[in-house]
Every structure is written in structure tokens, then in C-alpha cells.
């Protein structure tokens, strides 16, 4: 869901309103509390595992040695922050999160850190830059959040004064709309539920954020790769992680080995395998298992060779010439079922509308009042593939009457209720 909210922000940035807020950059936020997190050896170790590996904190909040395999943090600079990019009136800075009082997080309370990590609110009340993964970290359990804060307090303090992040005024206004306060308890996956664990890990690590082509002319599909990601002047296209021959079609053990070693295909150092290499076999296996539930996408993506046009994502990237849009074989659907599917469906959280109609015997969908027709191809009488959609759509049919909702079969199912 974090990535869907990011997509909504990107769409808003494409249609920017005139800035008129009295205090741009200040979002809605819950008040700070005086809570503190108890320090225990178990929490410190759990926090280290999360911050160094799953959450990849030091991939952004450190200067990195791009001449070393995997581009690890520069020795002695872990967590000291860095200027990630600077161009014109836009500067993106990952701040110093070491306990240095003068230039880092040493003067921040536990709740300031917790609110920043999970809710995207800086210690001064401003919204953090939307590229910080707090929308993914929002799904961190309360205990894991406490562990991360406790661990960050153990880092050696590093004196490193950095300039602030700067955003153009219009983007600053839009950026402040994204944070959402968290008041209710957040729990983690139940012990022993490996599928729930895999979803938790994928969500918190925001794997779909990089491995889905959110901004491409055509979305190849969830985890279908082709997203251009970068750090400074370095650019790479993310890999297809679905269980297709063009993606992660190899065995579980091979996936785990690749993630530990960084050796597989054309793995690029922008992909933070240096962090993921420290994940346990159990966690990597849980991730692999859940990726097997994602609809397979035919999309070859590489980072070696000349960029070529790709029909699947509409971009140019290495191996792009090997890609053609592949449509599934439609199954027969009874007429009385088809007649119950047309209607208007809406998900308020994402301001997402799907209009479904019948036309010349076909089921056609349009999103958000647009003019692009998407033919829905039946995978079953109630489950449909749409070219360019993030995931298949499942219609909910009662015993009689029209369908009541559509469920987009993403990692976290997104429900669109019938409104007409």
C-alpha cells in the first residue's frame, strides 16, 4: 500500500496546484509524547538486524564506497548522512542519524525518532521528503520500531554538518500531504505464519517500490521490474522478481544464494544487496515464497548492453528488444456472470476508480475517468487480467445480483467497492 500512496503523490505532482499554504512543509501530525524505549540486548540485536539489513538505513544515510563490491558505507561514516542529489532549487539530503548532539540525532527524543521513521515527520515538525520510505516503515510493528530506535542510539556519534533538504515550493506543499499519523497499535506477523512473514518483510523493505515500474509509460505489473532507480549520477533498471522465465524463475536455494552473495545476472550495486546479504535464510525464503504468489510478468530487464525500446514498459533499457506484451488465454465465462460485472468501483484510500462496461461482447475497464480502454481478459469467471494493470482483478459476486466489489490482487489486497 505504501507504493500505491507514492504513486498517488506522483500523479498529484504532475498536476500541481498553486501553493497557498501559510506554512508549506508542515503536515498533519500527532503530538509528540515523552515515551522512551527500554534498552535490552535483544532489542539492540533486533534493531541492528533491521536497520543494517531489512530497512537498509545506511544505504541512504551514509556516504558509500562505490569502488567496493556492493558499495558499502565508507568506514567510520555509518549513519552520518549524505547529500544524495542536488540540482537547481532541489536538494535531497539523508540526515545524520548518529547520536551526535550537534549535527545528528543526539538531541532527538525516542518519540521524535519513532515518528520520523514510521510517520514521516521530522523532529522539527516538517514532513520528511517523500522518497524516505516511511510509508513502508509505517507497517513496522511497534516492537520492531522500538528495536530500531534503541539500536540507533548505540551508533558511534559522527560529527557531520549537512545542509537541509530543499524542494520547490509546489512540491513542498504536495510533500506535506503524504504523512499520516499512526495512533493505533501495529503488530507484526504471527509466529509460524511464513506467508504473513514474507508479506511483512516485502512491505517493510519496500521491494515493490523499486521493482515495479510506477513511473513508466506502461506498468508491466507488480514486481515486474523496469523501474529506473538511481543514486546521484548512477542509474539502473530494477529486475523482474515474478516467477516468470524473464524474472526469478530459479529455485529457492538459488535466490537465497544470490541475495547473500550479490552474484546473479547483472546485479547492480544500486540494488542494496550489501544490506540484504545479511538477512537470514528463513527471511529470504519467506520473501521468495510470497513472490511466487504474484502474477507472473513477461519482462526481460538488464543493465548490461545498449538500451532498446521495450513494448512491455514503454521505456528503453537493455534487453528491451526481447519484450512483447503477452496476453493470457481467455476462459469462457457464462453470459449471466458477465452481465453482473459492469459498474463503477471506488477505493477511497487511494482515490482510485474503475469503471467497467460491456462493449461488443468484451469487458472493458477505465481508470480514474481516463479515456484509455483496458480489455479485461478472463482468467476465471470472476478473475480478470488487464494489460497495464498492476495486478489481476477479482470480482466479488453474491448469490444473486451485481458484483459488490473488485479486489486488486496486490501483495496487500486493495478493495474497490461498487458505488454505481
What do these predicted ranges mean?
Residues 4-17:
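Bacterial N-terminal signal peptides
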Residues 19-22:
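Boundary at the C-terminal end of the N-terminal hydrophobic targeting segment
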Residues 77-112, 135-145, 222-258, 273-285:
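Electron-transfer interface patches adjacent to heme c in soluble/periplasmic c-type cytochromes
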Residues 109-123, 136-162, 252-265, 275-302:
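C-terminal capping alpha-helices of c-type cytochrome domains
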Residues 48, 134-136, 173-249, 253:
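Surface-exposed interaction/gating patches
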Residues 324-420:
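Peripheral terminal and inter-domain segments
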Amino acid at each position: 500500500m505504501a507504493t500505491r500512496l507514492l504513486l498517488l503523490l506522483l500523479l498529484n505532482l504532475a498536476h500541481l496546484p498553486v501553493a497557498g499554504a501559510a506554512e508549506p512543509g508542515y503536515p498533519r501530525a500527532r503530538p509528540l509524547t515523552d515515551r522512551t524505549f527500554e534498552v535490552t540486548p535483544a532489542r539492540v540485536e533486533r534493531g541492528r538486524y533491521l536497520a543494517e539489513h531489512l530497512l537498509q538505513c545506511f544505504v541512504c544515510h551514509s556516504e558509500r564506497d562505490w569502488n567496493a563490491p556492493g558499495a558499502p558505507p565508507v568506514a567510520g561514516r555509518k549513519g552520518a548522512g549524505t547529500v544524495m542529489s542536488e540540482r537547481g532549487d532541489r536538494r535531497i539530503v539523508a540526515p545524520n542519524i548518529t547520536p551526535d548532539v550537534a549535527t545528528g540525532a543526539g538531541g532527538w527524543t525516542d518519540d521524535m525518532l519513532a515518528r520520523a521513521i514510521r510517520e514521516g515527520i521530522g523532529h522539527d515538525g516538517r514532513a520528511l521528503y517523500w522518497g524516505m520510505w516511511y510509508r513502508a516503515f509505517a507497517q513496522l510493528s511497534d516492537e520492531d520500531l522500538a528495536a530500531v530506535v534503541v539500536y540507533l542510539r548505540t551508533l558511534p556519534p559522527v560529527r557531520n554538518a549537512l545542509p537541509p533538504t530543499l524542494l520547490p515550493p509546489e512540491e513542498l506543499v504536495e510533500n506535506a500531504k503524504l504523512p499520516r499519523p499512526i495512533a493505533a497499535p501495529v503488530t507484526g506477523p504471527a509466529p509460524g505464519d511464513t506467508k504473513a512473514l514474507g508479506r511483512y518483510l516485502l512491505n517493510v523493505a519496500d521491494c515493490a517500490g523499486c521493482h515495479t515500474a510506477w513511473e513508466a509509460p506502461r506498468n508491466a505489473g507488480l514486481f515486474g521490474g523496469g523501474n529506473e532507480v538511481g543514486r546521484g549520477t548512477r542509474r539502473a533498471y530494477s529486475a523482474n522478481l515474478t516467477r516468470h522465465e524473464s524474472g526469478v524463475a530459479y529455485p529457492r536455494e538459488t535466490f537465497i544464494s544470490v541475495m547473500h552473495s550479490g552474484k546473479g545476472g547483472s546485479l547492480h550495486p544500486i540494488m542494496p544487496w550489501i544490506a540484504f546479504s545479511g538477512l537470514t535464510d528463513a527471511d529470504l525464503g519467506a520473501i521468495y515464497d510470497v513472490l511466487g504468489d504474484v502474477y507472473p510478468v513477461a519482462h526481460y530487464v538488464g543493465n548490461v548492453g545498449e538500451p532498446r525500446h521495450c513494448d512491455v514498459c514503454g521505456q528503453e533499457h537493455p534487453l528491451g528488444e526481447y519484450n512483447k506484451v503477452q496476453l493470457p488465454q481467455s476462459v469462457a465465462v457464462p453470459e449471466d456472470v458477465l452481465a453482473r460485472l459492469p459498474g463503477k468501483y471506488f477505493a477511497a484510500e487511494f482515490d482510485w476508480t474503475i469503471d467497467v462496461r460491456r462493449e461488443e461482447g468484451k469487458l472493458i475497464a477505465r481508470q480514474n475517468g481516463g479515456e484509455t480502454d483496458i480489455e479485461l481478459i478472463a482468467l476465471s469467471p470472476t478473475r480478470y487480467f488487464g494489460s497495464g494493470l498492476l495486478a489481476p482483478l477479482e470480482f466479488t459476486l453474491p448469490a444473486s445480483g451485481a458484483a459488490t466489489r473488485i479486489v486488486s490482487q496486490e501483495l496487500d489486497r486493495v478493495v474497490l467497492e461498487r458505488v454505481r
